[in-house]
């Protein structure tokens, strides 16, 4: 089996906290130097690389003299602010040794949820790549709250892959890849060499939580691969403890687990909608509506809505949930939650009678709806 990275030109590389820190006690300068050297080697092969790196909070804890990760959000944000300075400095220093310029980009979900800011971020990243700069991306932990967190840098890496239409996402961790079961508990567990991104059985294999330093377990990596597949990006989950892992992957060596994007590439606008992590509300739809959306490619009409949950405004992203509670689609709503509560279960011809006006005959037009 040949590594999919060999034939990939535009890469997003995500490096976890444990691979850039000294067991959480500040940054490991030597390790960061090795990552810079490997990325420089990939660049010399003509590959474009965007780096998503953890480590800011761990570095901030070290600089502030804290031995345990704080629980209070304001202290975490303070640690991130202090540590981000060191993280950027070390990366800049190490890449300069190879004649490569770096750029620091801090993102929040709000940056990508707003269409204009999303396009601006995309334009900036593509310009940096064109200029031969290596963008180094992290979540802007200083300003985010639990409500608007990406949740982990695996998810952020997938969103960046979609944003720049990357060919592949490489998630480097302290694990060898995805196993059929937890190898610490099951001696018969075997490494999954290759599978389809988004295959339902993968999520069952990937139970478990992450380390105390980071937030992402194997499940977040599997879900990130599924999300990256929206733009056609393949994913490799591999151990960052492997010597020269990036160089070897680029040479075609199969390391870890590679998850192939088999689904059709989404149109850019629909991909943006699918990548919304926080939807503003939910509508429960009947089985007939589920069938029309998933098999017929139809719009969602008010008559197919059973229940309305949450508060949302016109133009916001809402999720469509089937009778079994499973999300089947999401899209931009033509009506607010208050309006939807009045017109649900009604044929479109009665919208004007109920509301006194009709904005659109559909609750969500098929052009503004994406299956998930």
UniProtKB/Swiss-Prot annotation:
Bilayer-spanning residue ranges: none
Q: Which residues bind substrate?
A: 54, 141, 153
Its keywords, alphabetically, are: Amino-acid biosynthesis, ATP-binding, Cytoplasm, Kinase, Nucleotide-binding, Proline biosynthesis, Transferase
Q: What reaction(s) does this enzyme catalyze? A: L-glutamate + ATP = L-glutamyl 5-phosphate + ADP
The record's section on SMART domains has: PUA
The main location is cytoplasm
Q: Which domain of life is it from?
A: Bacteria
Q: What is its EC number?
A: 2.7.2.11
**Single GO MF descriptor:** glutamate 5-kinase activity
Q: Does the keyword Thylakoid apply?
A: no
Pathway the protein contributes to: Amino-acid biosynthesis; L-proline biosynthesis; L-glutamate 5-semialdehyde from L-glutamate: step 1/2
Any single GO CC term annotated in Swiss-Prot or TrEMBL for this entry: cytosol
* Localisation per UniProt entry: Cytoplasm
The keyword Membrane is assigned to this record: no
Could you say which protein family the record assigns here? Belongs to the glutamate 5-kinase family.
Q: Give a short account of what the protein does.
A: Catalyzes the transfer of a phosphate group to glutamate to form L-glutamate 5-phosphate.
Q: What is this protein called?
A: Glutamate 5-kinase
Organism of origin is Burkholderia orbicola (strain MC0-3)
């Amino acid at each position: 089996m040949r590594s999919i990275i060999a034939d990939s030109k535009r890469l997003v590389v995500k490096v976890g906290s444990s691979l850039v820190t000294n067991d959480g006690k500040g940054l490991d300068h030597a390790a960061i130097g090795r990552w810079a050297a490997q990325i420089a080697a990939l660049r010399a092969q003509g590959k474009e690389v965007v780096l998503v790196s953890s480590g800011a909070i761990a570095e901030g804890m070290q600089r502030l003299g804290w031995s345990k990760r704080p629980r209070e959000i304001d202290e975490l944000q303070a640690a991130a602010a202090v540590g981000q300075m060191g993280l950027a400095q070390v990366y800049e220093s190490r890449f300069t040794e190879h004649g490569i310029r770096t750029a620091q980009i801090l993102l929040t979900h709000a940056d990508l949820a707003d269409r204009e800011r999303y396009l601006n971020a995309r334009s900036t990243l593509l310009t940096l790549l064109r200029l031969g700069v290596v963008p180094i991306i992290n979540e802007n932990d200083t300003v985010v709250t639990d409500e608007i967190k990406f949740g982990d840098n695996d998810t952020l890496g997938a969103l960046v892959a979609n944003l720049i239409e990357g060919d592949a996402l490489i998630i480097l961790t302290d694990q060898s890849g995805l196993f059929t079961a937890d190898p610490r508990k099951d001696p018969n567990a075997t490494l999954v060499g290759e599978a389809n991104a988004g295959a339902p059985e993968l999520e069952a294999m990937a139970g478990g939580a992450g380390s105390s330093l980071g937030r992402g377990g194997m499940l977040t990596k599997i879900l990130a691969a599924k999300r990256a597949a929206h733009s056609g990006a393949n994913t490799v989950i591999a151990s960052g403890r492997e010597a020269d892992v990036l160089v070897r992957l680029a040479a075609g060596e199969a390391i870890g687990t590679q998850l192939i994007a088999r689904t059709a590439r989404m149109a850019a606008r629909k991909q943006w909608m699918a990548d919304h992590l926080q939807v503003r509300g939910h509508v429960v739809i009947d089985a007939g509506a589920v069938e029309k959306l998933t098999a017929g490619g139809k719009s969602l009409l008010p008559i197919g809505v059973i229940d309305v949950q949450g508060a949302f405004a016109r133009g916001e992203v809402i999720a469509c949930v089937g009778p079994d509670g499973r999300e089947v689609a999401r899209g931009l709503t033509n009506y607010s939650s208050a309006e939807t509560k009045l017109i649900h279960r009604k044929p479109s011809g009665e919208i004007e009678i109920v509301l006194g006006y009709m904005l659109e005959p559909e609750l969500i037009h098929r052009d503004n709806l994406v299956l998930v």
